[in-house]
């Protein structure tokens, strides 16, 4: 397995290095994307594919009276997210679970906000995953997707060749999948190669 495969599912020592790098490397696009998220101070938030936990920490700050949960199928990512958010976990405001977005343990209509930063590239069955996100999101809730790559760059093909199981979607493709899952009010924001999409249930 190449080092870059750790972007999909971090494992072992290389995975630990990768999640630390992602926390730093993805910070600019994450901060940009979060400006399009109107979350209440007491919101219940889920971060799908939470990686190294940096975005969970940002969401906890954005929702100071809320609860933020994270889910990731990589044990390395779960461990790192728990370390990064140790204080909030001790306060009962945060939890990190290992699992798949395609089959989540959460109850229907549970979260006010769900986020997915730099992760939908790797979801194996995107329509199914979007339906599952829709299921656990409250009516009126917001789903935010934030990607560094929007499918319009020649470099995108290079990344999909290096990283197995990676698909870089264009905004129009994601919009169709979201609407098929039941979402509406799909809004698309772009900055250079960056893409942020918000959708309502």
Question: Where do the PLM segments sit?
Answer:
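C-terminal alpha-helical "lid/dimerization" subdomain adjacent to the S-adenosyl-L-methionine
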Residues: 10-23, 142-198
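Conserved alpha-helix/loop element of class I SAM-dependent methyltransferases that forms part
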Residues: 24-43, 58
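Short glycine-dipeptide loop
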Residues: 42, 137-142
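A short acidic, Gly/Pro-enriched loop at the edge of an enzyme's catalytic core
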Residues: 102-113
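A short SAM/SAH-binding and catalytic strip from SAM-dependent methyltransferases
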Residues: 113-125
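A short glycine-rich, Lys/Arg-flanked "PGG" loop and its adjoining helix->strand segment in the class I
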Residues: 127-139
């Amino acid at each position: 397995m190449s080092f870059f495969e750790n972007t999909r599912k971090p494992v072992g020592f290389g995975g630990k290095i990768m999640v630390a790098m992602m926390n730093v490397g993805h910070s600019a696009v994450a901060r940009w994307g979060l400006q399009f998220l109107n979350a209440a101070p007491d919101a219940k938030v889920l971060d799908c594919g939470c990686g190294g936990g940096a975005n969970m920490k940002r969401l906890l700050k954005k929702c100071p009276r809320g609860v933020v949960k994270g889910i990731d199928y990589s044990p390395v990512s779960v461990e790192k997210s728990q370390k990064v958010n140790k204080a909030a976990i001790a306060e009962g405001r945060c939890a990190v679970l290992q699992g798949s977005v395609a089959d989540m343990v959460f109850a229907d209509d549970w979260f006010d906000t769900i986020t997915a930063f730099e992760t939908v590239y790797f979801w194996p069955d995107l329509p199914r995953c979007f339906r599952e996100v829709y299921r656990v999101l409250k009516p009126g809730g917001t789903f935010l997707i934030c990607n560094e790559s929007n499918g319009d760059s020649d470099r995108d093909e290079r990344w999909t060749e290096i990283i197995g199981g990676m698909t870089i979607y264009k905004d129009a493709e994601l919009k169709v999948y979201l609407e098929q899952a039941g979402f509406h009010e799909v809004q698309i924001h772009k900055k250079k190669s960056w893409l942020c999409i918000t959708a309502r249930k």
